[in-house]
Amino acid sequence: MARLLRLCTWLVALGPGLLATVQAECSQDCAACSYRLVRPGDLNFLACTLECEGQLPSLKIWETCKDLLQVSKQELPQEGASSLRESGKQDESHLLSKKYGGFMKRYGGFMKKVDELYPVEPEEEANGGEILTKRYGGFMKKDAEDGDALANSSDLLKELLGTGDDRDRENHHQEGGDSDEGVSKRYGGFMRGLKRSPQVEDEAKELQKRYGGFMRRVGRPEWWMDYQKRYGGFLKRFAEFLPSDEEGESYSKEVPEMEKRYGGFMRF
């Protein structure tokens, strides 16, 4: 009997609390159902709450609400994932705006659209070098492999132009035989025609030592030949009447006053 009395007292004490919690849960569920419906007025909130509490016979309002709540609970994980994605994107855009200032505000939408149109797969990110080689057909790889050949070809050009030393030339002839063959294969014999005879190279060496390569071009320029053809030796005959250095000295001694007066302007 004592146990029954204790149980009854506990039920009396906890009954109002349980009823309050049940009422609160029922009111929350009915409110959620009315919120989910397209027309909230179609659901009788009071009848739904009373049916949930068991105080009113079932009119299929609470059953409809339960079905709607189950469907909404199944959709909640997807909505939660989408909300997490949106929040992550917002945080990422916020960090980018902090890092790059107003640049991402102006061009961020464009870059985002490009990423959506042309997404990058993880395999492509991992194998970026292979994608570049596929896209450019091994062009960069070929340039990297031909770096030594280009260096050797530059040494060969220096040698042909006469800018290298004798020691460098000897070392190049000893060590760079393979590079010469590679250059000849690459340029199809074009560099072969630039080789000079020994006599011309000796003259070039002397000019190189004397003038530093500035006066390597020997002979009159083309414009002088055209000028000579145009005036037919007139300048040559005029040059005969001009006083030489010795005659100029005697002429200056004979007429010092004119020299002083006109400063050599009337010498001719």
UniProtKB/Swiss-Prot annotation:
One BP annotation, GO: chemical synaptic transmission
Pfam family, one: Opiods_neuropep
Location in or out of the cell: Cytoplasmic vesicle, Secretory vesicle, Chromaffin granule lumen; Secreted
Keyword Cell inner membrane tagged: no
Biased composition (Basic and acidic residues): 164-176
Residues with Phosphoserine modification: S252
Site entry: Cleavage: M111, K112, K113, T133, K134, M215, R216, R217, G219, R220
Major location category of this protein: cytoplasm
Keyword tags: Cleavage on pair of basic residues, Cytoplasmic vesicle, Disulfide bond, Endorphin, Neuropeptide, Opioid peptide, Phosphoprotein, Secreted, Signal
UniProt PTM: Proenkephalin-A is cleaved by CTSL to generate Met-enkephalin.
Propeptide: 197-208, 218-228
PROSITE patterns, sorted: OPIOIDS_PRECURSOR (PS01252)
GO cellular component: axon terminus; chromaffin granule lumen; dendrite; extracellular region; neuronal cell body; plasma membrane
Keyword rRNA-binding: no
Signal peptide: 1-24
Protein family according to the UniProt entry: Belongs to the opioid neuropeptide precursor family.
Protein name: Proenkephalin-A
